[in-house]
Design a protein with these regions (language model features):
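Acidic/proline-rich low-complexity IDRs
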Residues: 1, 19, 29-30, 107, ...
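N-terminal juxtamembrane cytosolic/stromal segments of multi-pass membrane proteins
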Residues: 1-25, 83-97
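Residue-level signature of transmembrane alpha-helical entry/exit and packing/kink sites
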Residues: 19-27, 58-66, 102-107, 141, ...
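Alpha-helical transmembrane segments in multi-pass membrane proteins
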Residues: 19-84, 105-106
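Aromatic-anchored segments of alpha-helical transmembrane domains
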Residues: 31-40, 112-120, 185-194, 229-235
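Alpha-helical transmembrane segments
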Residues: 31-35, 70-75, 114, 154-161, ...
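Juxtamembrane helix-loop-helix connectors linking adjacent transmembrane helices
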Residues: 44-60, 81-173
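Transmembrane helix-loop-helix hairpins at the membrane interface
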Residues: 138-235
Length: 235
């Protein structure tokens, strides 16, 4: 976290740091393109999937393949980032998270879950999506879709990390704004509106900004942010 007491945006005068920030931003753009290249697997539905699978299995098979691709892409992407930029979002934090922040994160996670449940007739979103007539195929389809969405969420939190690190290099001081969350909203959030047909697409898009807020409050802890993002998405 930035410790400069000046909360105005002040760009770093060091050209090397500005160039470094551009590398972080370029990496974030590449990450977005790489993750949503998974949508190209839809092009295989007609020549391949429709001849082998029928009904809901088409979408299930697509989600499995796309999720595997995203996790593999992010794995290779992370290795490249660690080698070229010498950073990793998975570094351990020497100091434990203060109890006050844990309590705040708990409230910021539980409140939107309960609020969404209230709008859905006091049902968790997970129950609402499953419906009243639960079958094995319904459970399989939802589990696979959550796997696919979890893969995209992993990429989104990684993007938030890259944007925040890029801003650290670009600015010597800045307001405590979730710039990474705004970037995730404008990239992953917009892509979700374009590529998904869920009744919750708008909610999912707005949550990307929320993840950026959680990331900063957690002290930039990737694992904490990703875990809370999964809970918010599923429930």
């Amino acid at each position: 976290m930035l410790k400069n007491k000046n909360r105005r945006f002040r760009i770093c005068s060091d050209p090397a740091m500005r160039r470094l920030s551009l590398r972080f931003f370029a990496a974030a753009a590449l990450l977005t393109l790489g993750v949503y290249a998974s949508e190209l697997f839809h092009l295989l539905e007609k020549p391949l999937f429709s001849r082998v699978y029928y009904g809901n299995l088409n979408a299930t098979f697509f989600a499995i393949i796309a999720a595997i691709y995203i996790f593999l892409f992010v794995f290779l992407f992370h290795r490249s980032i660690k080698k070229r930029l010498k950073v990793s979002p998975f570094e351990r934090h020497p100091a434990p998270m203060p109890l006050s922040r844990k309590a705040l994160l708990y409230c910021l996670t539980v409140f939107p879950i309960l609020l969404t449940a209230a709008f859905l007739g006091f049902h968790f979103k997970l129950i609402y999506e499953l419906g009243e007539r639960i079958t094995g195929m319904t459970l399989l389809g939802n589990a696979v879709n959550y796997l696919f969405s979890g893969a995209k969420l992993f990429g989104a939190v990684y993007l938030i990390f890259l944007i925040e690190r890029g801003c650290d290099a670009l600015f010597v001081s800045r307001p405590p704004l979730p710039i990474g969350g705004f970037a995730a909203l404008l990239t992953f959030g917009v892509c979700e509106l374009i590529f998904t047909s869920s009744a919750f697409s708008l909610l999912y898009s707005i949550l990307y900004l929320y993840y950026g807020i959680l990331y900063l409050i957690s002290g930039r802890r990737f694992g904490v942010t990703y875990s809370l993002a999964l809970l918010l998405y599923i429930l």
